[in-house]
């Protein structure tokens, strides 16, 4: 296995561990999710270079689009929580109801 792939797998594991450990603040959870998506994106980009398939080269771009949508929704929810309650605790998510 290449050293780059091992580093990206370790980055994914570290981001997952960070998501499990620092889940009290919403901003920390969003940063860990972005780290996970970035490591998955790099792993998919490296693996599609090995396949030399033009159809498979589209998948990392689709993942990047979904990651951007996830980040936009997460940041808008963070702004809503911080404007309403003044903090970014995850426990305030239960209080948001339409």
Curated annotation (Swiss-Prot):
It comes from the Eukaryota. Keywords: Electron transport, Membrane, Mitochondrion, Mitochondrion inner membrane, NAD, Respiratory chain, Translocase, Transmembrane, Transmembrane helix, Transport, Ubiquinone. Core subunit of respiratory chain NADH dehydrogenase (Complex I) which is composed of 45 different subunits. This is NADH-ubiquinone oxidoreductase chain 4L. The chain crosses the membrane at residues 2-22, 26-46, 59-79. The keyword Transmembrane helix applies. Its EC number is 7.1.1.2. It is a multi-pass membrane protein. GO terms for biological process: ATP synthesis coupled electron transport. It is found in: Mitochondrion inner membrane. One of its GO terms (cellular component) is mitochondrial inner membrane. The lineage of its organism: Eukaryota, Metazoa, Chordata, Craniata, Vertebrata. It is an enzyme of class 7 (translocase). Belongs to the complex I subunit 4L family. It catalyses: a ubiquinone + NADH + 5 H(+)(in) = a ubiquinol + NAD(+) + 4 H(+)(out). InterPro entries: NADH_UbQ_OxRdtase_chain4L/K, NUOK/Mnh_C1-like. It comes from Echinosorex gymnura. GO terms for molecular function: NADH dehydrogenase (ubiquinone) activity. Coiled coil: none annotated. Core subunit of the mitochondrial membrane respiratory chain NADH dehydrogenase (Complex I) which catalyzes electron transfer from NADH through the respiratory chain, using ubiquinone as an electron acceptor. Part of the enzyme membrane arm which is embedded in the lipid bilayer and involved in proton translocation.
């Amino acid at each position: 296995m290449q050293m780059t792939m091992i580093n990206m797998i370790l980055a994914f594991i570290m981001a997952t561990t960070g998501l499990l450990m620092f889940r009290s603040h919403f901003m920390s959870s969003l940063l860990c999710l972005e780290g996970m998506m970035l490591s998955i994106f790099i792993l998919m980009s490296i693996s599609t270079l090995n396949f030399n398939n033009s159809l498979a080269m589209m998948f990392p771009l689709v993942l990047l689009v979904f990651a951007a949508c996830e980040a936009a929704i997460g940041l808008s929810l963070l702004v809503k929580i911080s404007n309403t309650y003044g903090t970014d605790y995850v426990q305030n998510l239960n209080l948001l109801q339409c």
